[in-house]
Amino acid sequence: MFQDKGWVLVTLIALVTPSWAAYKLQERYSWNQLDFAFPNARLKEQALASGDYIPQNALPVGVEHFGNRLFVTVPRWRDGIPATLTYINMDRSLTGSPELIPYPDWRSNTAGDCANSITTAYRIKVDECGRLWVLDTGTVGIGNTTTNPCPYAVNVYDLTTDTRIRRYVLPAVDTNPNTFIANIAVDIGKNCDDAYAYFADELGYGLIAYSWEQDKSWRFSAHSYFFPDPLRGDFNVAGINFQWGEEGIFGMSLSPIRSDGYRTLYFSPLASHRQFAVSTRILRDETRTEDSYHDFVALDERGPNSHTTSRVMSDDGIELFNLIDQNAVGCWHSSMPYSPQFHGIVDRDDVGLVFPADVKIDENKNVWVLSDRMPVFLLSDLDYSDTNFRIYTAPLATLIENTVCDLRNNAYGPPNTVSIPKQAVLPVGPPLYTKQYRPVLPQKPQTSWASSPPPPSRTYLPANSGNVVSSISVSTNTVGPAGVEVPKAYIFNQHNGINYETSGPHLFPTLQPAQSGRQDGGLKTYVNARQSGWWHHQHQG
């Protein structure tokens, strides 16, 4: 009898435990506040004293992975942001709270040096040709105090040589007085020269296409799908209610190349629960900017509380997207209809994933998620004794396992009938070409589709204090509902960067001998704190 009661108790516990209790994303890096790899302690002290560096004013918003580097962007929303485009040397910093290294160097992060530097970067993209695409918005500040010392400019870097190989200034005809662009999608066709970039103008309500080969851009602006939904402008994140009702086209993802040689661009306005689509055949054609209304397709709504700012699609058609109202990351397999029953949640965390600002899939099908508590930063006050910013990672196969997006383990059907007009959506073929990449360190074993052990429960890697975060600390000085202007996604900066006469992205190591609690020259032995985690690194030599 007692055995039967015990079985019933276990069953009840299993029934009430949410499906995301066994966390799949694993925390790789975390910070109470961001730190930067200054050339030396004296220059850092000078920057702190002058206001060129104010640690509490830095918020990470974008992440991208390539080889042994993890790129992180920090917009110049407030004073004291020394660099906007940075990276982590993953060989030296396997976990913890590493200093951010300016990329490609300090001089290239000087705000206001329009021709030679990046003033503010948001989300960035590495393509399969080893190029890093960065849109410099040229702005400092946020909301009504935003200024534009520089024009919008596309900057492309060769990640093999760490040099800028292209700078293209968007012409005035492609922007308007309300323009704000924070997202980029890169479309590679038959070769590396057959490349296009697409930019979502969130507040100017347009979509800009740029051709690498032509070194030219054009704007699609005459479409209602770029505008916010007036019924979807109310947001609730981390116990804060706010309205971003003006936010239009924002997150974008690109499908694999289809049988006709083109991709599908999926996008959503931020103030919306709906996804839209258009073929890149239309976007690549400058002559279609004014007569393409009916080439855009409206898909279903995702359901309630499904605002999203970032999305990405794998080369086999699996889309991941952040769900900022739900502290979660969702998924959809593009071979299925775009309806709520075919949307899954791959992970959720009401502490660690508060505002998962960016989601990326790298060349090895590993997923990277950056969370930053942005609404708390903008509308209240962060507690800098708490962990505020985190970067998570996991293999894509692990994330979608046992979700509706894992078609190999589920018998869902029928195939998706939603397609771009005049085009057939056929199974995705092999890539047209491949390119060698630098090895990712540390290596992670591949997860089998056929059989995989349950993902480990999440135990946070030790931060500076070594304590597990159990709650979000938010200042009691919350913003009232009346008479308060909610900042948009972009306060004037009097100290706009540091112009150090140094060069080379690898000049300054991230681990200094004088730093307390750190080893010079890298970690000699590292085993994932979960004991059964993915990373196991033995320092050679």
From Swiss-Prot:
Compartments, as annotated in UniProt: Secreted
User: Which keywords does this Swiss-Prot/TrEMBL entry list?
Assistant: Developmental protein, Glycoprotein, Secreted, Signal
Name one process (GO BP) from the record. Answer: cuticle pigmentation
Signal peptide residue numbers: 1-21
Tell me the domain of life: Eukaryota
Q: Which Gene3D superfamilies match?
A: TolB, C-terminal domain (2.120.10.30)
Q: Which organism is it from?
A: Drosophila erecta
**Which portions of this protein are annotated as coiled-coil regions?**
none
One Gene Ontology cellular component term attached to this UniProt record is: cytoplasm
Pfam families, per the entry: MRJP
What protein name does the entry list?
A: Protein yellow
Q: Which InterPro entries match?
A: 6-blade_b-propeller_TolB-like (IPR011042), Royal_jelly/protein_yellow (IPR017996)
Q: Which residues are reported to be glycosylated?
A: 144
The entry sums up its family as follows: Belongs to the major royal jelly protein family.
Question: Which purpose does this protein serve, as stated in its record?
Answer: Controls the pigmentation pattern of the adult cuticle and larval mouth parts.
Q: Which PANTHER family match?
A: PROTEIN YELLOW, PROTEIN YELLOW-RELATED
